[in-house]
Each structure stands twice: as structure tokens, then as C-alpha cells.
Amino acid sequence: MHELSIAHNIVNIASAAAAEAGTEEISAVYLRIGALAGVVADALRFSFAIAAEGTPLANAELIIEEVPVTVFCPTCNTEVTLPNPRLFRCPHCGRPCGQIIHGRELELVALETP
């Protein structure tokens, strides 16, 4: 379960940012996680609650934006969002697509203070 190590890294980064900003508490952490990032959102939420205990993030809400897979279709010459991220075929023309534009993200976007 690598979500626990990810949660610890989020807590470390956010705690350092809180200390640098001179705040003692973080109320929310905003993340963007791509469908291909290999992260289970519920497992990350559970792990985050454990990792945040005793830190400025102890009462913080973890807000996750799930990013769908977007690829470039060379046949249609456009970016398309895949309805099924396991099939890398353009939903318009059915041809294979290989260039991933979005969907691998794992980004800490913002921190919110009370």
C-alpha cells in the first residue's frame, strides 16, 4: 500500500509549507490525481488521516480532484478524453492513441488555512 508513503510525503511537504508561512494549522489539502497514477483515492484518504495525526494537518480535509485520461489522437489531430482508461483508442475514430496528455498527475495543488 504505497498510499501511506504518499500520505507521509504530503504531510511533510504541507507541514514545511505551514511552518514557512508561519501558520499552525492547515484546514484543507487539495490534490489532483490522474486515473493512471496508480493511487486509490479512498486508501490515500485513510492513510492521510493516520499520517496527519499530531501534525498541523491533524484536522485537515483531503480534497481530491480525479483527473481523467486525455490523449492525443493523431488520426483526428485532437486531444480526447478516454471513457475507459484501459483502452487507448480514440472514442471518435477507434484508432490507437499513445501520447498521454493528462492522467498521470499526482500534484499537491493548494493548502487552506482556517
From Swiss-Prot:
Lineage, top-rank taxon, reads: Bacteria
Question: A GO molecular-function term, please?
Answer: nickel cation binding
User: What PROSITE patterns would the database entry show?
Assistant: HYPA
Q: Which residues take part in binding Zn(2+)? A: 73, 76, 90, 93
Annotated GO biological processes are: protein maturation; protein modification process
Q: Does the keyword Lipid metabolism apply?
A: no
Annotated residues that bind Ni(2+) are located at 2
Sorted alphabetically, which keywords does the UniProt record give?
Metal-binding, Nickel, Zinc
Instruction: Provide the function of this protein.
Output: Involved in the maturation of [NiFe] hydrogenases. Required for nickel insertion into the metal center of the hydrogenase.
Please give the PANTHER family that the UniProt record associates with this protein.
HYDROGENASE MATURATION FACTOR HYPA
Q: What is this protein called?
A: Hydrogenase maturation factor HypA
Q: From what organism does this protein derive? A: Chloroflexus aggregans (strain MD-66 / DSM 9485)
